[in-house]
């Protein structure tokens, strides 16, 4: 039986704000897994689930939940800013984000978004 592979995965290495960074994106049937590391490990695992749209805004709200690692407010903000576009572009699928970064500035978020976009599997 030929057809679409069960898993689609892409990876890219780039220098983000002077730090070597690896990004791996893998598409599963119900989730997109995004691994972003500058430390060579998976780090904090965050689940981003889209909620149902109840207003005329049109975009679902992403609910974040730290599954593994430090559950700090900055982690939730960073995760939403980093991968909200992945969920939207993937038809509002849930995203699992594994995050181990040194730099959590907005400059780093924008640069990391470009690397994630280059690994598009959705």
Curated annotation (Swiss-Prot):
GO terms for biological process: chaperone-mediated protein complex assembly; proteasome assembly. InterPro entries: Proteasome_assmbl_chp_3, Psm_Assembly_Chaperone. PANTHER family: PROTEASOME ASSEMBLY CHAPERONE 3. The keyword Chaperone applies. The gene is PSMG3. Chaperone protein which promotes assembly of the 20S proteasome. May cooperate with PSMG1-PSMG2 heterodimers to orchestrate the correct assembly of proteasomes. Belongs to the PSMG3 family. Keywords: Acetylation, Chaperone. It comes from the Eukaryota. One of its GO terms (molecular function) is molecular adaptor activity. This is Proteasome assembly chaperone 3.
């Amino acid at each position: 039986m030929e057809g679409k592979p069960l898993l689609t995965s892409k990876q890219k290495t780039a220098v983000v704000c002077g730090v070597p960074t690896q990004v791996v994106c893998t598409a599963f049937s119900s989730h997109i897994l995004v691994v972003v590391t500058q430390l060579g490990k998976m780090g904090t695992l965050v689940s981003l689930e889209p909620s149902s749209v109840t207003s005329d805004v049109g975009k679902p709200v992403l609910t974040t939940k730290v599954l593994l690692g430090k559950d700090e407010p900055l982690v939730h903000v960073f995760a939403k800013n980093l991968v909200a576009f992945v969920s939207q572009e993937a038809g509002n699928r849930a995203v699992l984000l594994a995050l181990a970064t040194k730099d959590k500035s907005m400059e780093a978020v924008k640069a990391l978004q470009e690397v994630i976009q280059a690994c598009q599997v959705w």
